[in-house]
Amino acid sequence: MQLYALGLNHHTAPLTIREQVAFQPERLDDALHDLTHERTVREAAILSTCNRTELYFATEQPQHAADWLARFHHMPLSEVSPYLYTYPQRDAIRHVFRVASGLDSMVLGEPQILGQVKDAVRRAEEAGTMGTLLHKLFQNTFAVAKEVRSTTAIGANIVSMAAAALHLSERIFERMSDQRVLFIGAGEMIELCAAYFAGACPKRIAVANRTEARAQLVAHRFGAEVMRLDVVGEMLPHFDVVVSCTASPLPIVGLGMVERAIKARRHRPIVMVDLAVPRDIEAEVGELDDVFLYTVDDLAQIVDAGLESRQQAVLEAEEIIDSRVNGFLHWMQARDAVPTIRALRQHAETVRAVELERATRLLAKGEDPRKVLDALSHGLINKLMHSPTRYLNQSEGEQQADASRLVQQLFNLSNSPD
């Protein structure tokens, strides 16, 4: 039985595809049971986030997993297969270690993914689809992720626009839990920013977008409210932080709109983060006394500094992961040898029992104990050495040379002629 990882993520698939193969939480149990009812899949766990859908499973026939994924989501395999990756055992182990450690995330080193992996494991345990291999794999996965985060600086520096946006907001407002945040737009950048801000538990989150359906998707994920784009000016005074990133060719937030908002707020400060190119917020807004306006260029300076510090941490993390992959593979190989070890010990025990019974009978008849013990030891040697000796005698040519080396290694023998 081999371990595999199959899936797609933000590196390989656009959002339109990722949405179609995502697993809704209420359907996850059914999916796990359905997958493991495939005759070839023995164990399984499913990780499904906004950025990735991955199956971790034990099988001898991994090709059936892709068929199952497409079938479960009522998609032609040809539609999803160009975006899929399938990792065999060593690569699968390394992949899940990297995912949980944040090395494969859209935001390098982000901590949320570890919690998402733990949730995926918990759901698989509750569904009864975890077995010995996956239990051990994820036990090691969590240990590796903890080691990476505790011994490297992988999560210590800001390396994304989203993280930088939160960082700059926290410079102005000491407690984000007391602030109200408005997101204008509902694309991937806004979704990523929302993930960071939601982690700081603001008092209120709202999403304004031209397309209400898309805004609903983002709002549902983060417990936010949906707002029409045409009421942003009216509602602006009620928000302390505004993050905007749309594809609009013209500014959405103008100077007059912000001036009225500041007046209504009685000059309480407001942080505005404009991630759009071209800008969503008129540049003149930044000249207002109570407005802290940051653009893409401002955030890029923070990100660049973080990236430089992060490179060494990535190298250190990869070294840890490679070492732990080898350790896990060693455990798997040792586990594969367990049945043979048991059979070998059982064979030796059978020989011992037979010879001991014979010796006991001889002693009961009054035979010389020394002779009985001598016969016992010779009997054990002859029977235990019979199979290896016959194997050597029956081997020929290169096979005999290999057999000789194997026996010498097994019994720690020297190769001297005498």
UniProtKB/Swiss-Prot annotation:
The keyword Transferase does not apply. Gene3D superfamilies: Glutamyl-tRNA reductase, N-terminal domain, NAD(P)-binding Rossmann-like Domain. NADP(+) binds at residues 185-190. Pathway: Porphyrin-containing compound metabolism; protoporphyrin-IX biosynthesis; 5-aminolevulinate from L-glutamyl-tRNA(Glu): step 1/2. Keywords: NADP, Oxidoreductase, Porphyrin biosynthesis. Substrate binds at residues 49-52, 105, 110-112, 116. SUPFAM superfamilies: Glutamyl tRNA-reductase catalytic, N-terminal domain (SSF69742), Glutamyl tRNA-reductase dimerization domain (SSF69075), NAD(P)-binding Rossmann-fold domains (SSF51735). One of its GO terms (molecular function) is glutamyl-tRNA reductase activity. One of its GO terms (biological process) is protoporphyrinogen IX biosynthetic process from glutamate. Transmembrane segments: none annotated. The active site is at residue 50. It catalyses: (S)-4-amino-5-oxopentanoate + tRNA(Glu) + NADP(+) = L-glutamyl-tRNA(Glu) + NADPH + H(+). Its EC number is 1.2.1.70. The record marks 95 as: Important for activity. InterPro entries: 4pyrrol_synth_GluRdtase, 4pyrrol_synth_GluRdtase_dimer, 4pyrrol_synth_GluRdtase_N, GluRdtase_CS, GluRdtase_dimer_dom_sf, GluRdtase_N_sf, NAD(P)-bd_dom_sf, Shikm_DH/Glu-tRNA_Rdtase. Belongs to the glutamyl-tRNA reductase family. NCBIfam families: hemA. Possesses an unusual extended V-shaped dimeric structure with each monomer consisting of three distinct domains arranged along a curved 'spinal' alpha-helix. The N-terminal catalytic domain specifically recognizes the glutamate moiety of the substrate. The second domain is the NADPH-binding domain, and the third C-terminal domain is responsible for dimerization. PANTHER family: GLUTAMYL-TRNA REDUCTASE (PTHR43013:SF1). Homodimer. This is Glutamyl-tRNA reductase. It comes from Aromatoleum aromaticum (strain DSM 19018 / LMG 30748 / EbN1). The gene is hemA.
